[in-house]
Amino acid sequence: QMCIRDRAHGIRDGILADLGCGTGELTLMLTQAGYDMIGIDQSEEMLCVVRDKAEQLGLSGRLLLLRQDLLKLDLYGTIRAAVSTFDTFNHIPDLDTAIANAGFFMEKGGVFLFDMNTPYKHRNVLGDNAFTFEEEDAACVWRNHYDAANRRVEITVDIDYHETGEHFHEQFCEYTYDLDTIR
């Protein structure tokens, strides 16, 4: 919120889009701060979580949620700014198209704030490493395989919930982009 208002060319109003909004934490925080928000995600499950949270906070009528692939972004008008967090753009195989799509709907002088994992993190931190996390109610094993030829990290996450015996398994990949490509 402060980054947009104070540091990002003074964006104090207008429509903002949260690209890859996930469970909507940032979308809802910016809505509460008075911004007109569009939360965009390709997962209907994630958008349902945002809807439920918005309803609990009394924000249902103050934001628009769209199920869209960022490689096929289609908005009804322009936006003043876009935000994208939690390495959303590392999950997209065609970064140029995704950024161009966001830019197409951006007002002149608009701002795009996003974070990404760096090539260093993909190679040296995630690499071919595995991480384990143990909590009172669950255990998580996070495995990585760095595929240098295809410039991506293949990630497998397994979570076991002790009390219920439930098991969660997910596989996905993050693509590696050099800073020159991002600029």
Q: Over which residues does each language-model region extend?
A:
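Short, small-residue-biased leader/transition segments that mark boundaries at the very start
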Residues: M2-I4
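Glycine-rich helix-loop-beta junction characteristic of Rossmann-like nucleotide cofactor-binding loops
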Residues: D6-I11, L73
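Conserved class I S-adenosyl-L-methionine
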Residues: D13-G20
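Conserved SAM/SAH-binding loop
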Residues: T23
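Class I SAM-dependent methyltransferase SAM/SAH-binding core
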Residues: T27-K72
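A short acidic, Gly/Pro-enriched loop at the edge of an enzyme's catalytic core
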Residues: D74-A81
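A short glycine-rich, Lys/Arg-flanked "PGG" loop and its adjoining helix->strand segment in the class I
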Residues: D96-K108
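SAM-dependent methyltransferase
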Residues: K108, L113-R183
